[in-house]
Design a protein with these regions (language model features):
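PAPS-dependent sulfotransferase catalytic core
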Residues: 1-65, 176
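PAPS-dependent sulfotransferase catalytic domain
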Residues: 72-175
């Protein structure tokens, strides 16, 4: 799962993936939640440089989980490694919103006051955040074009799904 900060990917995950009975939600705990305006905005582990877990598939994906089923691995910076991630054979969701909408929503959701995950050490300041949103969105859209993916606009964001060939499919982030 990838999307730039402010892409509203957490809402998609909460509404469409965490509600499935076959999804492992054992990564969720009170210290991995962020609430704003009375709404639960973030829950579960996030994988990115300077976050609690790094985005390295080889060593980090299993760390926050103890259950079974499909695992939702969320990383903003997966946008930079989509071709490499294809080789793992898992379904991937890519969430996109225009750069300015991402930036505005991220600030509306709490911006630098977001307590989980902590964006300050990787994105640094507003200019750094704008640059990263632009770069992450560019990489996502380049991959979408390269793979010929069609998106679904749910009124909040555009959702793309990449699926590996059926003989290599592991779906979401199934272990094993």
């Amino acid at each position: 799962m990838t999307g730039a900060p402010g892409s509203r990917w957490s809402g998609f995950v909460n509404d469409c993936l965490y509600t499935r009975p076959d999804v492992d939600t054992s990564d969720q705990s009170p210290n991995r939640e962020y609430w704003a305006h009375g709404d639960l905005m973030h829950k579960g582990a996030y994988f990115d440089p300077s976050f609690e877990f790094m985005n390295s598939p080889e060593s980090e994906w299993d760390k926050p989980f103890s259950g079974t089923g499909y695992r939702v691995i969320k990383s903003h910076t997966f946008a930079f490694m989509l071709d490499r991630l294809k080789e793992h054979g898992h379904d991937m969701y890519l969430i996109h919103r225009p750069d300015d909408e991402c930036y505005e929503w991220w600030h509306t959701a709490g911006g630098w006051d977001i307590t989980y995950p902590d964006y300050r050490r990787y994105y640094w300041d507003n200019d750094g955040m704008k640059d990263q949103i632009r770069l992450q969105n560019k990489h996502i859209l380049d991959f979408v074009k390269q793979e010929g993916l069609e998106g679904y606009d749910d009124g909040k964001r555009t959702i793309y799904r990449w699926r590996p060939p059926t003989n290599t499919r592991k779906n979401l982030t199934e272990t094993g």
